[in-house]
From Swiss-Prot:
Residues 375-387 have a biased composition (Basic and acidic residues). The gene is ast. May function in EGF receptor signaling. May play a role in compound eye morphogenesis. The lineage of its organism: Eukaryota, Metazoa, Ecdysozoa, Arthropoda, Hexapoda. It comes from the Eukaryota. Residues 388-427 have a biased composition (Acidic residues). Belongs to the asteroid family. SUPFAM superfamilies: PIN domain-like. This is Protein asteroid. Expressed in the proliferative tissues of embryos and in the mitotically active tissue anterior to the morphogenetic furrow in eye imaginal disks. GO terms for biological process: compound eye morphogenesis; compound eye photoreceptor fate commitment; imaginal disc-derived wing morphogenesis; imaginal disc-derived wing vein morphogenesis; larval somatic muscle development.
Length: 854
């Protein structure tokens, strides 16, 4: 949810509110959505403009949890679910902001846009590490806090909500993901670091990293750390800072029951900050004249000072007296909900982990004496606070424009308050899992279903996540809308379940009440959010029993929406593909038939990407930096290249071993030699990075090429959602082994002007591995049977045009050479050639010429 301005406020006063901490041998509750977004931001950088490099992101997640395992940290990952009704206004605002970024995107932009499959790839990596993971029904904040209180362990996140929760909180910005080693000392001295304050340089580093918004600067394991000398016992730990609510509620400042009101006054996703403008104007006076602080920072100081002199009841009464009547109930319900969440003991995650994981809780710590005496350590915070305020740098002197911008946002949001107040309050239920049937929770908790399914069930809405796409085209998810509509129909036509009256019905047809889906997406060509209602087109083709779903629903989607694909033949030939590729290639065929913007070069690029990622990254260590790759494997590359050059000089042609020829082409891929992978990776490694030309001429970057790939991602996402709802009749695609946005774009660019794509792949992209080339041909030939007739072109028109240009260029060059040769020729050359060599020549000016001997 987020409390506006509180993260920056704490970071600027890190010496007061944060304490150094050694993280090891403990449980750790992790905010999965927050961690995934911050890891992706640090790993990919500017490459988010190409639609997602899932391979790099997956490896970063795995490395992160390997570091935790080295320090004997038992993590528990909780993922967010759907949106609550009261947060839709904020969701719409964020969606509009993202649309404006997409409209102006260029590959050099520093803004990170999260790809569609980010959370699914993160969950795959977490599962592969053996870490317990669960998806909550709605936002995971309360569940995170409840689980952390039960286990008496910290929460790892980067969300200002946890500054007001009654939990131990480790801001992700303070975590150094580098394993450190320390000697075990006596118990008293080992606890000294937790009790001391941050040094000035440490606090300054926290502020610097907060401003740079950098979370993980480099993940390092013990392989890079020096071992300690001697035989004394050691332990490994991660350096970080920890926060407890007692640091903010020190003696003489706030009491815990005032924290929910404090957070509401600052503004969050559920209540507009401008709702309190009358209160700030009349009840609290000016927020100070200091130009060193942002407006929100001044507001926090004033609120803290004012709440110090008030009780929780009197403060709430004074705030309510300055609100409009139609806003009072909303604030009271929000404060009450926050108070209940502050000490909530209802924890579904604890029960789920205990039931589904063996030895789920090896670390459950009792409350220590140090935590009970935190109030004593924080009693001097008021004195330190004044010292820090006097010594603040003038590093925010340029914040006048930001203050004006905040004021403008307050004015704009004030216009929306009347609409928000008229919507009515959402029905508050203490246990929100009661809003959903048990079969749905059984599929949701293991994170098998995407979070959007909660919105489909609860709100009957779908908030489309716009991708990097061509702005003048319709949104990339439009080609997958029939699949989404079918999923919505299944969720609301469950066998043996009482059908409740829909929240929203379509009354266009007299006498019928058909539930419809509200679809939120970007409007065409303008920076705005488009709402439109999408009724269920028709009932599912087969009954839907959630406990034993019918796999034929997948076939029904193709029969209805890709009739030219010969569905019977398509599904009968799926057995010829590896199990992990079947759903992926179903998505490819659907995309080829539904998309107007894809061509066969997109298909070639997709197949090349999966062949390379699925083979090379599994066989040899994954390395994307060219210099590092050559440094690590340069000797191997040189030796193998020498062997192959010698064989080529002797006329020996490398082939496939006879034993492998007996296997099918897909089965041979498990036997690809490492030497093939090293040489192929060396050749293809530059294509995993953004082209240098984009740094000078970013207008050469083509969003039309990206748009077709974005449509494909949407098809995979929706088809995989349907597959998970049907209990996985086909294996879910592992996007980290299939899709790399930068590589796909570069492959398309390389193949764009090739008259014979297969020849170019064989001789220039995969010449070092016959097995990989055969697999590429095998997959393309499998798809060729189902390519729509209107896309079957023997020669791509772009390539044909390029070939014609080359021919004309050669003809012009030949004509120029002829003209040049004629221009410099000797005019008497013909006379010399035609002269009779028998006729002697006598030079009259040379008296000795007649003496010439014959």
């Amino acid at each position: 949810m987020g409390v506006r301005g509180l993260t920056s406020y704490i970071a600027q006063r890190a010496e007061i509110y944060l304490k150094p901490h050694e993280l090891h041998s403990t449980a750790l509750v992790i905010d999965g959505d927050n961690l995934s977004c911050n890891l992706y931001k640090d790993v990919t950088g500017s490459y988010s403009a190409f639609g997602g490099d899932y391979d790099d992101f997956y490896r970063a997640v795995v490395q992160f949890f390997q570091v935790l395992a080295e320090c004997n940290i038992r993590p528990y990952v909780l993922m967010d679910g759907g949106y609550e009704e009261r947060k839709l206004r904020t969701v719409s605002t964020r969606l509009r902001n993202k649309i404006s970024v997409i409209k102006k995107i260029n590959p050099n932009a520093s803004i990170t846009l999260f790809p569609l499959h980010l959370k699914e790839v993160f969950v795959d990596a977490v599962r592969d590490c053996g870490v317990p993971v669960m998806r909550c029904v709605f936002e995971a904040d309360d569940e995170l806090a409840a689980l952390a209180r039960k286990l008496n362990c910290p929460v790892l996140s980067y969300d200002s909500d946890f500054y007001i929760h009654n939990v131990k909180y480790i801001p992700l910005i303070t975590l150094t993901v580098k394993v450190l080693t320390k000697q075990v000392k006596d118990k008293n001295s080992s606890n000294q670091k937790d009790s001391r304050d941050l040094r000035h340089c440490e606090a300054k580093n926290v502020k610097k990293r907060t401003r740079a918004n950098k979370i993980v600067t480099g993940i390092q394991t013990t392989g890079l750390t020096a071992s300690t000398k001697g035989s004394s016992k050691t332990y490994k730990y991660l350096d970080c800072c920890i926060y407890r609510v007692s640091h903010l509620c020190g003696r003489g400042t706030l009491s815990p029951e005032k924290l929910p009101l404090f957070a509401a006054l600052l503004g969050n996703d559920y209540i507009a900050r401008s709702a309190f403008k009358n209160f700030f104007a009349a009840g609290m006076g000016k927020a100070g004249r200091s130009r060193k602080l942002k407006l929100q920072q001044k507001r926090i100081q004033v609120i803290l000072t004012w709440l110090k002199e008030e009780t929780a009841e009197s403060a709430l009464a004074k705030v309510l007296s300055r609100l409009k009547k139609n806003q009072r109930d909303s604030l009271v319900s929000q404060v009450n909900a926050a108070i209940s969440g502050y000490s909530n003991e209802l924890c579904h995650a604890y029960d789920y982990f205990d039931e589904h994981y063996e030895n789920a809780f090896p670390y459950i710590e009792p409350v220590s004496e140090e935590e009970c005496s935190d109030d004593e350590h924080s009693s001097s915070s008021d004195e330190k606070f004044s010292d820090v305020e006097e010594g603040e740098d003038q590093e925010e002197a340029d914040n006048q424009d930001e203050e004006q911008q905040e004021e403008n946002q307050d004015v704009d949001s004030g216009d929306e308050e009347e609409e928000e107040a008229d919507e009515g309050l959402e029905l508050e239920v203490e246990d929100k899992t009661l809003l959903f049937p048990q079969w749905f929770l059984d599929k949701l908790y293991p994170a098998h279903l995407p979070r959007s399914f909660v919105d489909l069930m609860h709100l009957r809405k779908y908030i489309n996540n716009p991708q990097i796409e061509h702005f003048p085209f319709h949104d990339s998810n439009e080609v997958a809308l029939p699949i989404l509509n079918y999923v919505f129909a299944l969720l609301h036509h469950v066998e043996c379940e009482k059908i409740e009256l829909p929240l929203e019905v379509d009354m266009d047809i007299e006498g019928s009440t058909v539930p419809y889906l509200t679809y939120l997406t970007r409007a065409l060509r303008v920076t705005n959010v488009r709402y439109f209602k999408m009724p269920i087109e028709k009932k599912p083709a087969y009954p839907f029993d959630p406990l034993s779903p019918d796999a034929r629903h997948l076939r029904a989607v193709f029969e209805d929406n890709a009739p030219n694909a010969d569905t019977e033949k398509l599904f009968s030939k799926l057995d010829q593909l590896p199990e992990d590729l079947r759903l992926y290639f179903l998505a490819i065929i659907y995309w080829l038939h539904r998309s107007e913007h894809c061509d066969l070069l997109h298909l070639h690029s997709l197949i090349l990407s999966l062949v390379v990622l699925r083979t090379i990254d599994v066989t040899i260590p994954a390395e994307r930096e060219v210099k590092t790759f050559l440094k690590r494997f340069g000797k191997t590359l040189k030796a193998e290249r020498a062997v192959r050059d010698k064989e080529a000089a002797e006329g020996i042609k490398r082939g496939i071993k006879p034993a492998l020829l007996e296997l099918s082409v897909p089965d041979r891929m498990a036997h690809v030699p490492k030497s093939d992978c090293y040489l192929t990776q060396e050749r293809l490694l530059p294509h995993f990075h953004m082209q240098e030309i984009f740094k000078k001429k970013f207008d050469l970057y083509s969003t039309t090429v990206i748009h077709a790939f974005a449509e494909f991602q949407a098809v995979v996402y929706q088809l995989n959602g349907l597959n998970s709802l049907l209990d996985f009749p086909l294996l879910s695609p592992r996007m980290n082994q299939l899709y790399c946005g930068a590589f796909l774009y570069n492959m398309y660019d390389v193949l764009r002007n090739r008259a014979d794509v297969r020849y170019h792949v064989e001789n220039f992209l995969l010449p070092d591995s016959k097995l990989m080339f055969d697999f590429y041909c095998y997959l393309y030939d499998w798809c060729a049977e189902f390519i729509p007739t209107w896309k079957r072109l023997e020669v791509d028109p772009t390539a044909a045009k390029a070939l014609q240009k080359k021919r004309l260029k050669k003809q012009r060059q030949a004509a120029r050479k002829v003209e040049l040769r004629e221009a410099i020729a000797d005019p008497n050359a013909e006379m010399v050639e035609d002269a009779d060599p028998e006729n002697d020549f006598f030079d009259l000016n040379n008296k000795f010429c007649a003496l010439k001997v014959a």
